[in-house]
């Protein structure tokens, strides 16, 4: 059944990129509807590290101060090997804004973004199953039989995006690595200070990052075939503890203290960068953003950060194209003109995001390969020469300013 009064802009997916786009449009006075397949906001992965580019995006969206108030600023990181014997190295971050970094809980960020939107912007339990052409419009079919008609369709629906599939994207490639993530709460304080601890070697990379005085986010990526995505949480915890057995006791205690329902494992996936060279990021009045556009391995910490970049830039390009607070003022006579403006706006967005996406995907995959490679010579080369270079590379890729919502 086709609904009356369908919105002019439909965003599929209430994740970071979807809500960032919706908030950006709302700041410009443009109404949108966000379709989310689950019953509530989802925060898969627990937390992620935010760098300079993420804070620029949050400032543009108007949520930066609130998020800062909930999370401690990191003062530096400690990098070492996963095995005993080699002392770790420490790097302190300068106090300038270019080095601002915090470990942000996804749930708190999503709630902050959702809180900026008018009521009923997000429509939960709304799974998209089919997209149909209808002149200058697209008809979006939901699993409950509802049909929504829209002038702009934005796919922010993750790595297996329905919108991305409509555009011609293939499913993401699967790596040989798995990631185990957890969030640990310490009622009396964790005692870690405000540093990002990272350890790697022998096919393993792990990190322990304080979000605030009481909460630590941790992860471990590996190439083991001993476990898979069906492995239960108790075995996962034992596996992680075995991999980090040579690390200091306070580090191991983070994993030991983690509740079993506060752990998750997933296989790492990415978009082959060459696919972005010939695939359509946008077509007609449809585009993709976030993981639907550029799924990447987590090795440079840019998945969530770049998703916010997408949201700001997409909202700005659409705002320029629409040139009004609403599309409702268009008559049938100039509807085609409005369609062309939107099409050009989305092409501009695609042009801005293509090479940035290719760069991030390629860098993340390469850094992950180097950090988790096995072998005596690779280990020696990495430990002696590459650790500081890789750390600088991570910071370099974060030095990107998406700009404001208004050009």
Curated annotation (Swiss-Prot):
Keyword Lipid biosynthesis on entry: no
EC id: 1.14.13.-
Top-level taxon in the UniProt lineage: Eukaryota
One Pfam family from the record: FAD_binding_3
GO MF terms, alphabetically ordered: FAD binding; monooxygenase activity
Any single GO CC term annotated in Swiss-Prot or TrEMBL for this entry: plasma membrane
Cofactor: FAD
Gene3D superfamilies listed in its UniProt record: FAD/NAD(P)-binding domain
InterPro entries named among the record's database cross-references: FAD-bd, FAD/NAD-bd_sf, MOase
GO BP term (any one): response to oomycetes
Keywords carried by this UniProt record: FAD, Flavoprotein, Monooxygenase, Oxidoreductase
Tissues with expression: Expressed in seeds, seedlings, roots, leaves, flowers, pollen and siliques.
Similarity-based family: Belongs to the 3-hydroxybenzoate 6-hydroxylase family.
Subunit structure: Monomer.
Name of protein: Monooxygenase 2
Species per Swiss-Prot/TrEMBL record: Arabidopsis thaliana
